[in-house]
Swiss-Prot record:
Family, similarity comment: Belongs to the non-disulfide-bridged peptide (NDBP) superfamily. Long chain multifunctional peptide (group 2) family.
MF annotations from Gene Ontology: toxin activity
UniProt-recorded name of the protein: Meucin-49
Keyword Aminoacyl-tRNA synthetase applies: no
Source species of the chain: Mesobuthus eupeus (Lesser Asian scorpion)
Length: 75
């Protein structure tokens, strides 16, 4: 299963659990925010954002690295 399907299953499960325990939308959001999955997603998002910001702020480092030239083969 891919991550999108697992995320949908997780949200639906949380909705069912909340409905059984008298649904309160605020507690549902709080529970989702504190879940392990949400923490992993936030950490991954922060990491990707940090990497993107570093690439945008310092593009000269990438441009300075020349592309490797393929060596000519002898026959």
């Amino acid at each position: 299963m891919n991550k999108k399907i697992l995320l949908v299953i997780f949200i639906v499960t949380m909705l069912i659990v909340d409905e059984v325990n008298s649904f309160k939308f605020g507690s549902f959001i709080k529970r989702m925010w504190r879940s392990k999955l949400a923490k992993k997603l936030r950490a991954k998002g922060k990491e990707l954002l940090r990497d993107y910001a570093n690439r945008v702020l310092s593009p000269e480092e990438e441009a300075a690295a020349p592309a490797p030239v393929p060596a000519k083969r002898r026959r």
